[in-house]
Curated annotation (Swiss-Prot):
PROSITE patterns: HSP90. It is found in: Cytoplasm. Molecular chaperone. Has ATPase activity. GO terms for cellular component: cytoplasm. It comes from Klebsiella pneumoniae subsp. pneumoniae (strain ATCC 700721 / MGH 78578). This is Chaperone protein HtpG. Residues 337-552 are annotated as: B. Pfam families: HATPase_c_3, HSP90. Its main location: cytoplasm. It comes from the Bacteria. PANTHER family: HEAT SHOCK PROTEIN 90 FAMILY MEMBER. Homodimer.
C-alpha cells in the first residue's frame, strides 16, 4: 500500500468510543442499522450529484447495500456502491467529529450518565458504533468519479490511532469490514443478521442484499438475495405501514435511539402535490440551544433526496419537528437560495406548520402523559411561537401549559382552556404573574386578594415568559392581565369599603402626602390599596410601564433598560403601616417608610441595591 500513515484520533473520538462501547453494549445490534443507514445516505448523495453529473454512476446505476460474512475469519462486511470517499474525506469523517459543542457535551457526561444509552444515542454515533462488536474495523473506499488507483484504506482498533493508505479499488463506494470481538459470533449467523436487517432497515428505499453461497458441481456459487422491501416508506399507503416501521424510520432519519412521541403521515394532491411525514421526538437533542444546531426537514423532490436540514419549511419555534417532505412542485436543481424566495416553499411552510400544530393538539387531547413529556422537553421552544407566528397564535396558545395557583405544584400542566373553564362569574381577564422562580411567584403578595376571592392565577417563572406575554395579549376573547400591574379589574375585586373604613382612610391622607414628600421622584405615585390582606406594602407598575421581569431580561442581555418607575401601594389595615402613620419623629418616620419600600422592592425584584442598609434599618427598628 502506498502513502501509508498512522494518525491519532481527535480526543473527542476516543472519549466517544469509550463511552459508547460501555453504554450501548446492551443494545449492540444497532451497529448494523447505523452502518446500513450511512450506506443509504451515501446512495442518496450519489443520486443527487448524478442529476448534474450522470458519469458518476460509472455505468452502474443500480444502487444497493450488500452484507456478507466470513465465518472462518470471523468478519462481517457491509458494502455499498454509493458516493464513496477520497483520502481527505476519510480523515475528516472517520478521524474527527465535526459537530460543534462536542467537547463540552462529552465533558458534561459523568460516569453515571455514561450508562445512559439515550444520551449517547441521540448524539448520532453512526460509523463508530461498529466498535461495539468489533475489535478492529477496516474500511476500503473510492469516491465516485475518481480513478481506481485513488482508493483509500482505513483501519483502526478503536483505541488511540488509525492507519490510512492509498489502494486500488475497481468499484466506487465504501466497504466496511468488522473483525468481531470474542463472543460476538451471533453476527455471523445468517438468520440473525436477516432478522436485524428486517427489523431496522425495511423502510430504506435502497435494496439491502445478503450473500448466499451454494455448492453446485463442486463449486461455490455466490448470489445476492434482497431482504428488505426497498420502497421509500413515505411513498407507501398509511394502511400498509405499521407503528414499528414508522418508529424505525424515525430513528433512521433523526439518528435518534428513542421512539418518537407521535407522527403524522400525509399525502396532499391538487393545487400542490407533496407527501409529508412529520415526527415529534421524545427527547430534546443535547445541542438544541447551540447556535450551530442544525434543524429542519429532509427534502426530497419527486422521491430524489435533495438536502438534509431544510429549515425553510418549519418556523423556528417548531425546530424540534423531525421528518421529511417530498414535493412534486419544486425543481430537481433546487438550492437553499431558491427555497428561500419560492412561493411553493411559503405555501408548504404554512401547510406544514398547521399540520405540526394539529399533531401536537391531537397528542395533548389523546395522551396527556405523553404531552407532558413533550412539554418538559420542548415547552420552552414552543413559547417562542406567539411572538414569531401571530397568524397561528390562538392554536399555539392552546398548546401552552402553566403552573397555577389551582394545582399547588410547580409542574406546568394547566392549559388555557382549563383555566377559562374555571373562571369565576364576572371575571373578565386571565390573571398571571411572572417571577424568577415558581416559589417567588407562588408567594408573591400580589396574589393575596385573588387567593382570598378564589381566583386562579398563572404562575410564570421561565425566563422567556415575560417576553412571550408581551405578545400573547388574549385567549378566547379574554385579555391577559399581569397582577403586578395596576388595573381597574383588580380594584373591582376588592371588598366594598364601609363608611368607617372610608373615614379612617381619609384620616390617612396626610400620611400618604408625607410619604410622597419623603420619597419624591423615586416612585411614580403613593396610594392606599385594598389588594393586600397580609402584606403591609407592594410596588406595582402602570399598564404601559416596563415590568420588573422585562427590565431583568434587558439587563441579562447586556442592554440598557429604562428605569422602572413603581407605584408604592400601602395597606391601610396593616399594623406596620398604622405604626408608621403614627410616628411623629421625622427621622424615625423616614426609617419606617424606607423599610416598607425596601420590603416591597425585595418581594418584587428579589434583590436590593443596598441589602446592608436594609439589614441595618431592620435591626434598628426591631430594637427600638
Amino acid at each position: 500500500m502506498k502513502g501509508q500513515e498512522t494518525r491519532g484520533f481527535q480526543s473527542e473520538v476516543k472519549q466517544l468510543l469509550h463511552l459508547m462501547i460501555h453504554s450501548l453494549y446492551s443494545n449492540k445490534e444497532i451497529f448494523l442499522r447505523e452502518l446500513i443507514s450511512n450506506a443509504s445516505d451515501a446512495a442518496d448523495k450519489l443520486r443527487f450529484r448524478a442529476l448534474s453529473q450522470p458519469d458518476l454512476y460509472e455505468g452502474d446505476g443500480e444502487l444497493r447495500v450488500r452484507v456478507s460474512f466470513d465465518k472462518d475469519n470471523r468478519t462481517l462486511t457491509i458494502a455499498d456502491n454509493g458516493i464513496g470517499m477520497n483520502r481527505e474525506e476519510v480523515i475528516d469523517h472517520l478521524g474527527t467529529i465535526a459537530k460543534s459543542g462536542t467537547k463540552a457535551f462529552l465533558e458534561s457526561m459523568g460516569s453515571d450518565q455514561a450508562k445512559d444509552s439515550q444520551l449517547i444515542g441521540q448524539f448520532g454515533v453512526g460509523f463508530y458504533s461498529a466498535f461495539i462488536v468489533a475489535d478492529k474495523v477496516t474500511v476500503r473506499t473510492r469516491a465516485a468519479g475518481d480513478k481506481p488507483e485513488n482508493g483509500v484504506f482505513w483501519e483502526s482498533a478503536g483505541e488511540g490511532e488509525y492507519t490510512v493508505a492509498d489502494i486500488t479499488k475497481a468499484d466506487r463506494g465504501t466497504e466496511i469490514t468488522l473483525h468481531l470481538r470474542e463472543g460476538e459470533d451471533d453476527f455471523l449467523n445468517d438468520w440473525r443478521v436477516r432478522s436485524i436487517i428486517s427489523k431496522y432497515s425495511d423502510h430504506i428505499a435502497l435494496p439491502v442484499e445478503i450473500e448466499k453461497r451454494e455448492e453446485k458441481d463442486g463449486e461455490t456459487v455466490i448470489s445476492w438475495e434482497k431482504i428488505n422491501k426497498a420502497q421509500a416508506l413515505w411513498t407507501r399507503s398509511k394502511s400498509e405501514v405499521n407503528d414499528d416501521e414508522y418508529k424505525e424510520f424515525y430513528k433512521h432519519i433523526a439518528h435518534d435511539y428513542s421512539d418518537p412521541l407521535t407522527w403524522s403521515h400525509n399525502r396532499v394532491e391538487g393545487k400542490q402535490e407533496y407527501t409529508s411525514l412529520l415526527y415529534i421526538p421524545s427527547q430534546a437533542p443535547w445541542d438544541m440551544w447551540n447556535r450551530d444546531h442544525k434543524h429542519g426537514l429532509k427534502l426530497y423532490v419527486q422521491r430524489v433526496f435533495i438536502m438534509d436540514d431544510a429549515e425553510q419549511f418549519m418556523p423556528n419555534y417548531l425546530r424540534f419537528v423531525r421528518g421529511l417532505i417530498d414535493s412534486n412542485d419544486l425543481p430537481l436543481n433546487v438550492s437553499r437560495e431558491i427555497l428561500q424566495d419560492s412561493s411553493v416553499t411559503r405555501n408548504l411552510r404554512t401547510a406544514l406548520t398547521k399540520r405540526a400544530l394539529q399533531m401536537l393538539d391531537k397528542l395533548a387531547k389523546d395522551d396527556a402523559e405523553k404531552y407532558q413529556t413533550f412539554w418538559k422537553q420542548f415547552g420552552l421552544v414552543l413559547k417562542e411561537g406567539p411572538a414569531e407566528d401571530p397568524s397561528n397564535q390562538e392554536a399555539i396558545a392552546k398548546l401552552l401549559r402553566f403552573a397555577t395557583t389551582h394545582t399547588d405544584s410547580s409542574a406546568q400542566t394547566v392549559s388555557l382552556e382549563e383555566y377559562v373553564s374555571r373562571m369565576k362569574e364576572g371575571q373578565e381577564k386571565i390573571y398571571y404573574i411572572t417571577a424568577d422562580s415558581y416559589a417567588a411567584a407562588k408567594s408573591s403578595p400580589h396574589l393575596e386578594l385573588l387567593r382570598k376571592k378564589g381566583i386562579e392565577v398563572l404562575l410564570l417563572s421561565d425566563r422567556i415568559d415575560e417576553w412571550m406575554m408581551s405578545y400573547l395579549t388574549e385567549f378566547d376573547g379574554k385579555a391577559f392581565q399581569s397582577v403586578a400591574k395596576a388595573d381597574e379589574s383588580l380594584d373591582k375585586l376588592a371588598d366594598e369599603v364601609d363608611e368607617s373604613t372610608k373615614e379612617a382612610e381619609k384620616a390617612l391622607e396626610p400620611f400618604v402626602e408625607r410619604v410622597k414628600n419623603l420619597l419624591g421622584d423615586r416612585v411614580k405615585e403613593v396610594r392606599l390599596t385594598h389588594r393586600l390582606t397580609d402584606t403591609p406594602a407592594i410596588v406595582t407598575t402602570d399598564a404601559d410601564e416596563m415590568s420588573t421581569q422585562m427590565a431583568k431580561l434587558f439587563a441579562a442581555a447586556g442592554q440598557a433598560a429604562p428605569e422602572v418607575k413603581y407605584i408604592f401601594e400601602l395597606n391601610p389595615a396593616h399594623q406596620l403601616v398604622k405604626r408608621a402613620a403614627d410616628t411623629q419623629d421625622d427621622a424615625q418616620f423616614g426609617e419606617w417608610v424606607e423599610l416598607l419600600l425596601d420590603q416591597a422592592l425585595l418581594a418584587e425584584r428579589g434583590t436590593l441595591e443596598d441589602p446592608n442598609q436594609f439589614i441595618r434599618r431592620m435591626n434598628q427598628l426591631l430594637a427600638s
